[in-house]
């Protein structure tokens, strides 16, 4: 039984090592970098409107920005919702503490 398991493991390793996925690891890395760059271009920057895409805010220094919404009343009395990407208060406090700690401890 042990011999069968070892032989199966060896066959799996040999077939895996001969596959094309391992031949070019630099291409896989390049593709992942390109995908990350594309994601960065598509995200919504801080203080920009995110009403139509509430989960598309970019990442800040430490945290991802959150889509914060408010209700706006026009002169006609119509209520509409407007949203923007921003830093929530508890994230601002955490960034302040981390920044203060960096100044003190180097």
UniProtKB/Swiss-Prot annotation:
Disulfide bonds: 43-58, 50-67, 57-85, 69-83
Compartments, as annotated in UniProt: Secreted
Gene Ontology cellular-component terms listed: extracellular region
Gene Ontology MF term list: toxin activity
Segments traversing the membrane: none
Pfam families linked: Toxin_35 (PF10530)
Signal sequence region: 1-19
Propeptide feature ranges: 20-40
Keyword annotations: Disulfide bond, Knottin, Secreted, Signal, Toxin
The family this protein is said to belong to: Belongs to the neurotoxin 19 (CSTX) family. 04 (U1-Lctx) subfamily.
Annotated protein name in UniProt: U1-lycotoxin-Ls1b
Organism: Lycosa singoriensis (Wolf spider)
């Amino acid at each position: 039984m042990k011999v069968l398991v070892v032989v199966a493991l060896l066959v799996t390793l040999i077939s895996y090592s001969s596959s094309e996925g391992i031949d070019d690891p630099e291409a896989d890395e390049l593709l992942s970098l390109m995908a990350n760059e594309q994601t960065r271009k598509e995200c919504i920057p801080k203080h920009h409107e995110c009403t139509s895409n509430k989960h598309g805010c970019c990442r800040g220094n430490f945290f991802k920005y959150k889509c914060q919404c408010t209700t706006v009343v026009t002169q006609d009395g119509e209520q509409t919702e407007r949203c923007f990407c921003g830093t929530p208060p508890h994230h601002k406090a955490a960034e302040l503490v981390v920044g203060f700690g960096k100044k003190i401890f180097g």
